[in-house]
């Protein structure tokens, strides 16, 4: 997208925020180069990468790419044949070791490629070069020094060099002791790369040798004694041999690096891509941002065949404003209307609202999470057109109005139904009557095109036009006449009101002047303001009712879940009781069959005492017969039931089961308890499915108990609490939730630095009432909410 568009919507500042969160210099470069893409598949991929990075940092908060270095110039120098310095070679080794460390970290998790498939691509791109890594590690030390292990020749030279050095120093120390009267000071130093001793100028003949230097006073000569000449020569020769061997080693290592140039540059780019993904995740944490949904096109298509795209932003905030004070806005485009016309006072937030939508669209299409509430989403826009502010084109000597018109002309020529158009103060800077007419004509053309858009204006004529025109919707920024300041709330569905007279009165303008102003306004404007005020009052009432309805819905959902759990538990106990009865009956029948066989054998065989066995068997058989017949009578009663208090029944009209708690003969109704609720149903619509408890106990079945559950909200908020207080509240809450029979709960801890989230996860890991837990989905709170499944 055009750089001018990115600048107007301040996307360049988002780039800087992202670059500041990179740990690798190459990643910082990439952060300053990121741009939105219009390829929907690419946007989905970029968001998936950010999602995986956010999950990785949530699970491993201290994760980092480590010691990656920018080795691009080093590799390129090696390709040109320049012999690399040891310190440069070391940067290559550091990068290879950092890449190897990353591979080990990821592969420590057997399912890493399944859990982080997108990040795994970056890690797999960091090709392992074990041979090169081993050669470099053997040759170059952590401070950039060439090690003795670089080659056997270098090790041998350095051993000889050490011995020669020690012999040389030992001989010089002896000379100092032997020639004390000629020595200026008892020390050894170096001149011209050779060891010398300080000799007094007046005793020069006492120390035969070569003078390499003279002190500033002329009193001291620095002499290389002839006695150490060969030792000095040997030491210098070995130094030269060491230098040649080091140069040879560096030449070999340089060639090895040049040969692996493609792989090394690939490692650099893979490391930068991984660090950039982590930076996007860190930015999401800091902005309290969520992953945006990619909304599919909906609705009819315009003649050109372009689908209608959508915007759905809930509690959206401008990412460059302080999130603690920024007022969130809700904006939806593309469902009920295509273009939102925002009116309101200056500095009231109209431009901020427009910029927020545009900037969040750019962020989403660059793979960034957006500062908004879960459930927010946008379509992918191939083109976004923006005209913001009253900047002038000095080079072309254009007026403010002309500058705006040039942008609008380009927009109308290029935009289509897949475009997002954002026009700030449409057609401003000219005669108000002509400007209003021009603005209306532009809006009509945008509707014909089918573009999605937001337009801000001061023209009151556009309020009326938007009210009665399909595809347009009014919106305003709220103004507090008491404080004489905007609240920055965006009120969709309400055109903006004029507050000039209220402000003037509160500032002390004489009442007669205000009254005269009202006369000059005529009746239309005040009536419109009163109508808008009434609409605002009704909107606030509707919002209050909607909030109450949402609370009731959540409570009802909680009660429904609890009732379902209770009914399921009762049904399970009923099935278990019935199975127990059947097992008892089967055992009795088996016993009866065995007794019958014993009687039959006794009757045929004289070996059995016929009278005694037969009488005992008959008595046992009679007992079994009595118990089985009793069970049979019970079964027949179930088939033709007479309903009584305590019976387990099914409400055939509702498909629910419950226990009879009262019978009302006068109305022929039965009162049934289902969980905590009681309902009355006609007796004809109730079917007895299980005997009352006294009868169950007679047929060996345990009673089915129903416990009243306490009401517990399915969500607890711990944001802003200290860890110790939060864990104490959470522990007590989990106990209540389990006793209430909640299968799961939501723990809202916020994102922040992640400290509270980590402490909560550690606490849940060993909690006896917790079956499992997981982070909420990206559209249900993401990293700021943990869903806990309970042992119920």
From Swiss-Prot:
Protein name: Endonuclease MutS2
GO molecular function, one term: endonuclease activity
One Pfam assignment: Smr
Biological processes, Gene Ontology terms: mismatch repair; negative regulation of DNA recombination; rescue of stalled ribosome
Every Smr domain range: 716-791
Cross-referenced InterPro entries: DNA_mismatch_repair_MutS_C (IPR000432), DNA_mismatch_repair_MutS_core (IPR007696), DNA_mismatch_repair_MutS_sf (IPR036187), MutS (IPR045076), MutS2 (IPR005747), P-loop_NTPase (IPR027417), Smr_dom (IPR002625), Smr_dom_sf (IPR036063)
Function: Endonuclease that is involved in the suppression of homologous recombination and thus may have a key role in the control of bacterial genetic diversity.
Listed CDD domains: ABC_MutS2
Assembly information from the UniProt record: Homodimer. Binds to stalled ribosomes, contacting rRNA.
UniProt xrefs under PROSITE patterns: DNA_MISMATCH_REPAIR_2, SMR
Signal peptide bounds: none
Residues that coordinate or bind ATP: 344-351
Alphabetic keyword roster: ATP-binding, DNA-binding, Endonuclease, Hydrolase, Nuclease, Nucleotide-binding, RNA-binding, rRNA-binding
EC number, UniProt record: 3.1.-.-, 3.6.4.-
Gene symbol of the encoding locus: mutS2
Family matches, as NCBIfam families: mutS2
Family of this protein: Belongs to the DNA mismatch repair MutS family. MutS2 subfamily.
Lineage: Bacteria, Pseudomonadati, Thermomicrobiota, Thermomicrobia, Thermomicrobiales
Organism, as annotated: Thermomicrobium roseum (strain ATCC 27502 / DSM 5159 / P-2)
């Amino acid at each position: 997208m055009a750089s001018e568009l990115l600048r107007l919507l301040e996307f360049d500042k988002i780039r800087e925020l992202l670059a500041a969160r990179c740990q690798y210099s190459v990643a910082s470069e990439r952060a300053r180069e990121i741009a939105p893409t219009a390829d929907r598949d690419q946007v989905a991929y970029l968001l998936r990468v950010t999602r995986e990075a956010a999950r990785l940092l949530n699970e491993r908060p201290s994760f980092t790419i480590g010691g990656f270095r920018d080795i691009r110039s080093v590799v390129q120098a090696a390709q040109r044949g320049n012999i690399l310095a040891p310190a440069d070679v070391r940067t290559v080794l550091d990068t290879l070791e950092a890449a190897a460390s990353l591979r080990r970290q990821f592969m420590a998790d057997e399912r890493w490629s399944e859990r982080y498939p997108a990040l795994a691509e970056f890690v797999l791109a960091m090709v392992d070069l074990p041979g090169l890594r081993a050669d470099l590690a053997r040759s170059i030390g952590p401070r950039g020094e060439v090690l003795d292990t670089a080659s056997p020749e270098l090790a041998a030279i350095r051993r000889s060099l050490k011995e020669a050095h020690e012999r040389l120093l030992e001989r010089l120390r002896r000379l100092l002791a032997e020639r004390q009267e000629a020595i200026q000071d008892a020390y050894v130093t170096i001149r011209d790369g050779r060891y010398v001793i300080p000799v007094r100028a007046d005793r020069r003949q006492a120390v035969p040798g070569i003078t390499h230097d003279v002190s500033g006073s002329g009193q001291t000569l620095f002499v290389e004694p002839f006695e150490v000449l060969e030792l000095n020569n040997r030491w210098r020769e070995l130094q030269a041999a060491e230098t040649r061997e080091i140069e040879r080693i560096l030449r070999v290592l340089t060639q090895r690096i040049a040969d692996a140039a493609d792989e090394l540059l690939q490692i650099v780019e893979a490391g930068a891509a991984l660090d950039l993904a982590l930076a996007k995740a860190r930015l999401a944490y800091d902005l309290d941002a969520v992953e945006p949904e990619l909304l599919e096109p909906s609705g009819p298509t315009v003649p050109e065949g372009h689908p209608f795209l959508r915007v759905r932003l809930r509690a959206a905030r401008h990412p460059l404003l302080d999130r603690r004070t920024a007022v969130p806005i809700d904006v939806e485009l593309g469902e009920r209307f295509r273009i939102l016309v925002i009116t309101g006072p200056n500095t009231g937030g109209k431009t901020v609202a427009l910029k927020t939508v545009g900037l969040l669209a750019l962020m989403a299409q660059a793979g960034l999470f957006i500062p908004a509430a879960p459930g927010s989403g946008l379509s992918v826009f191939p083109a976004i057109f923006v005209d913001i502010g009253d900047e002038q084109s000095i080079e072309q000597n254009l007026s403010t109005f002309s500058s705006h018109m040039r942008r609008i002309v380009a927009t109308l020529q290029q935009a289509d139904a897949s475009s997002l158009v954002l026009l700030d103060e449409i057609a401003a800077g000219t005669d108000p009557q002509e400007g209003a007419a021009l603005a209306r004509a532009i809006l009509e053309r945008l509707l014909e095109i089918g573009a999605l858009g937001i337009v801000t204006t001061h023209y009151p004529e556009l309020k009326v036009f938007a009210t009665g025109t399909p595809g347009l919707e009014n919106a305003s920024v709220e103004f507090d006449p008491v404080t004489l300041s905007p609240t920055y709330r965006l009120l969709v569905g309400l055109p903006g009101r004029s507050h000039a007279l209220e402000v003037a009165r509160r500032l002390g303008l004489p009442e007669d002047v205000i009254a005269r102003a009202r006369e000059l306004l005529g009746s239309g404007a005040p009536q419109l303001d009163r109508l808008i005020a009434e609409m605002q009052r009704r909107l606030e009432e509707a919002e209050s009712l909607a909030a109450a309805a949402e609370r009731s819905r959540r409570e009802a959902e909680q009660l429904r879940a609890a009732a379902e759990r209770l009914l399921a538990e009762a049904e399970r106990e009923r099935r278990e009781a019935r199975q127990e009865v059947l097992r008892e009956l089967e055992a009795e029948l088996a016993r009866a069959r065995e007794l019958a066989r014993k009687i039959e054998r006794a009757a045929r065989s004289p070996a059995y005492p016929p009278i005694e066995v037969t009488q005992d068997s008959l008595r046992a058989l009679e007992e079994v017969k009595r118990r089985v017949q009793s069970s049979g009578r019970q079964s027949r009663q179930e088939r033709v039931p007479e309903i009584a208090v305590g019976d387990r029944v099914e409400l055939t009209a509702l498909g629910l089961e419950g226990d009879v708690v009262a019978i009302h003969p006068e109305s022929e109704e039965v009162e049934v308890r289902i969980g905590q609720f009681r309902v009355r149903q006609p007796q004809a619509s109730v079917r007895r499915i299980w005997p009352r408890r006294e009868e169950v106990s007679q047929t060996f079945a345990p009673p089915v108990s129903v416990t009243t559950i306490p009401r517990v909200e399915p969500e607890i908020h711990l944001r802003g609490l200290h860890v110790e207080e939060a864990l104490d509240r959470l522990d007590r809450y989990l106990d209540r939730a389990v006793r209430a029979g909640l299968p799961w709960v939501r723990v809202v801890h916020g994102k922040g630095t992640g400290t509270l989230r980590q402490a909560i996860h550690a606490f849940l890991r060993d909690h006896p009432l917790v079956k499992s837990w997981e982070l909420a989905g990206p559209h249900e709170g993401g990293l700021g909410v943990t869903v806990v499944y309970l042992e119920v």
